[in-house]
């Protein structure tokens, strides 16, 4: 039996950054683990995550996920962490070096696309992205509407 990839199985999908592909050209993706505390992983499993304004950076040879909101766990006490704290990403050194090289280009950033649970561990799918201009967004919307119109016409035949 073929092994399912993380993109085929959406049962464990926690959060998805839907605006990312609208606002950016995503050229490459990489999967990274997250260092979370106990109450944070409970909030993640409860789907209380917002990736919208998040981004990742490489500092001192370590990758960090920033500005991702993981809500406080309802039943947590003083163990709850700051919802917007920086979280360390677990990547191999080769992957970090590859990202550092790619991030040297002007206008390239690292954004979270999806967060999911894989084999009991929280993972985040990061995308190497370059920002779109307004005319690129309009062109994509126009192309999408044309495809819908073609599908609608073809459906009747």
Swiss-Prot record:
Q: So which domain of life are we looking at?
A: Bacteria
Tell me where it resides: Cytoplasm
InterPro entries, A to Z: SmpB, SsrA-bd_prot, SsrA-bd_prot_CS
Q: Which residues form a coiled coil?
A: none
Q: Which GO terms describe its biological process?
A: trans-translation
Q: Which GO terms describe its molecular function?
A: RNA binding
An example Gene Ontology cellular component term from the record? cytosol
Listed A to Z, the keywords are: Cytoplasm, RNA-binding
Function description: Required for rescue of stalled ribosomes mediated by trans-translation. Binds to transfer-messenger RNA (tmRNA), required for stable association of tmRNA with ribosomes. tmRNA and SmpB together mimic tRNA shape, replacing the anticodon stem-loop with SmpB. tmRNA is encoded by the ssrA gene; the 2 termini fold to resemble tRNA(Ala) and it encodes a 'tag peptide', a short internal open reading frame. During trans-translation Ala-aminoacylated tmRNA acts like a tRNA, entering the A-site of stalled ribosomes, displacing the stalled mRNA.
Family per UniProt?
Answer: Belongs to the SmpB family.
> PANTHER family, alphabetically?
SSRA-BINDING PROTEIN, TMRNA-BINDING COMPONENT OF TRANS-TRANSLATION TAGGING COMPLEX
Identification of the protein by name: SsrA-binding protein
Tell me the gene name. smpB
